[in-house]
Amino acid sequence: MLLVMDMGNSHIHIGVFDGDRIVSQIRYATSSVDSTSDQMGVFLRQALRENSVDLGKIDGCGISSVVPHLNYSLGSAVIKYFNIKPFFISMDTTDLDMSAVEAHQVGADRIASCISAIADHPNKDLLIIDLGTATTFDLVTKDKKYLSGSIMPGVKLSLNALCQGASQLSSVTIVKPEVAIGYDTKTNIRSGLYYGHLGALKELKRRSVEEFGSPVYTIATGGFAGLFKEEDIFNEISPDLILRGIRIAFLENNKKGV
């Protein structure tokens, strides 16, 4: 079985593949994961056991990380506690054509999502929207040319910034509001948060497609993708897009002996 991990700024998303099938998924706050290799190793083994994963069957590990200061500890934990050399996805481990961008600046999670999207839709121009800590737009052509896109604060990050910057405002649960014109402060915040982000999504998509000059197939992923499932923005929502991209990159690089 293959252990894959998407280490993000807010959450670590862990998946276990048996062949091409995900048999277990676990999500924890990144802040809850201690930073030493021993603490990480114990945490990973415990988390997998609690989800009925047979640790003895794990024979490979692929990682996407946008938290560089945790990479060494995470890699060391996998080596020490699973006796596996982990594979880290990067610009150097993909056959995406990244010549149009500053490739070293592109996050591993964005690379993984593009790899997975291309595998699912090999003959389409694609727009991948990842709604996580940040909301990112990535455009990749049917010829596997990565064109990048845009980045804006994510839904939760926007809410946190609002509440931290305005002393009389407090946090709210993030849900789609029933109305745009709120009747109290909480519904005001929900309305601004939801419809403000929705407007940004629609406008960034419109401008991206206009600049690209051709229709695109739009895939959403990330923790907040489902929040906008009723809106006419995405062609599909793929919650495990990054995990599947890590798996594909791991298998491709194993063939090359990397």
UniProtKB/Swiss-Prot annotation:
Entry keyword set: ATP-binding, Coenzyme A biosynthesis, Cytoplasm, Kinase, Metal-binding, Nucleotide-binding, Potassium, Transferase
InterPro entries in UniProt: ATPase_NBD (IPR043129), Type_III_PanK (IPR004619)
Keyword Lyase belongs to the record: no
Residues the record marks as active site: D109 (proton acceptor)
Pathway assignment: Cofactor biosynthesis; coenzyme A biosynthesis; CoA from (R)-pantothenate: step 1/5
UniProt EC number: 2.7.1.33
Reaction catalyzed: (R)-pantothenate + ATP = (R)-4'-phosphopantothenate + ADP + H(+)
Top-level enzyme category: transferase
Localisation per UniProt entry: Cytoplasm
GO cellular component, one term: cytoplasm
UniProt entry tagged with the keyword Transport: no
Any one GO MF annotation of this record: metal ion binding
GO biological process, one term: coenzyme A biosynthetic process
Cofactor note: A monovalent cation. Ammonium or potassium.
Binding site for substrate: G107, A108, D109, R110, T185
Binding site for ATP: D6, M7, G8, N9, S10, H11, I12, H13, T133
Co-factor requirement: NH4(+); K(+)
Positions contributing to K(+) binding: D130
Similarity annotation: Belongs to the type III pantothenate kinase family.
Biological function: Catalyzes the phosphorylation of pantothenate (Pan), the first step in CoA biosynthesis.
Subunit structure as annotated in this protein's UniProt entry: Homodimer.
PANTHER family the UniProt entry points to: TYPE III PANTOTHENATE KINASE
Name the record gives this protein: Type III pantothenate kinase 1
